[in-house]
């Protein structure tokens, strides 16, 4: 592991947990609005979301808005013995392995069906880098689904100039903050407007 990753991750998680509730709510609302305006979201049929941990952005308004548009929303489930997450429908959400609600087994969809991953992260950088919680689930999952678009979202304070990266770290294609939408060309996934 890169020597700066662990202390940086710990600092970002602590900072995220300390974000005032009103700032988190306002930021989440702005990010949902900006995300719903993206042409890639308008064209998507299947989108993954996540159940937020303390201090993470609220995704329920995005989930409800996407479902109202007829988009299938999937949520991650940890699969014992695998780093690749399974994604299933929300109608069977229940407490899971990491203490986060996840879909019951049997509601999974193939990774190849997913158009867009909305990925969580403790921090992102200005070149499409993402830092997660360190377990590697999203890096393994994104590597297994290279054709799907990857969108990160964070408060502006968690967008850093640069994050330490290793070979297994998977980049994102777009980043949405309350004030900006950043587009990254490293994977060549975006043609036309995002």
What are these regions (language model features)?
Residues 1-112:
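N-terminal active-site beta-alpha-beta segment that forms phosphate/nucleotide-binding
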Residues 49-51, 119-120, 177:
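Redox-cofactor binding/interface segments in oxidoreductases and associated redox assembly factors
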């Amino acid at each position: 592991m890169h020597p700066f990753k662990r202390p940086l991750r710990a600092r970002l998680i602590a900072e995220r947990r300390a974000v005032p509730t009103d700032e988190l709510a306002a930021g989440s609302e702005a990010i949902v609005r900006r995300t719903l305006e993206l042409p890639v979201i308008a064209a998507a049929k299947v989108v993954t979301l996540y159940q937020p941990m303390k201090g993470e952005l609220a995704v329920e308004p995005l989930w409800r808005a996407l479902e109202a548009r007829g988009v299938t929303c999937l949520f991650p489930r940890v699969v014992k013995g695998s780093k690749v997450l399974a994604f299933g429908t929300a109608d069977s959400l229940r407490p899971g392995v990491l203490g986060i609600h996840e879909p019951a087994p049997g509601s999974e969809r193939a990774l190849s069906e997913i158009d867009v991953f909305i990925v969580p992260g403790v921090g992102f950088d200005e070149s499409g880098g993402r830092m997660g919680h360190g377990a590697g689930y999203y890096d393994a999952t994104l590597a297994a689904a290279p054709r799907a678009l990857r969108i990160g979202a964070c408060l502006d304070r968690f967008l850093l100039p640069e994050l330490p990266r290793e070979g297994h770290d998977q980049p994102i294609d777009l980043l949405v903050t309350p004030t900006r939408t950043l587009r990254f060309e490293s994977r060549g996934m975006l043609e036309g407007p995002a």
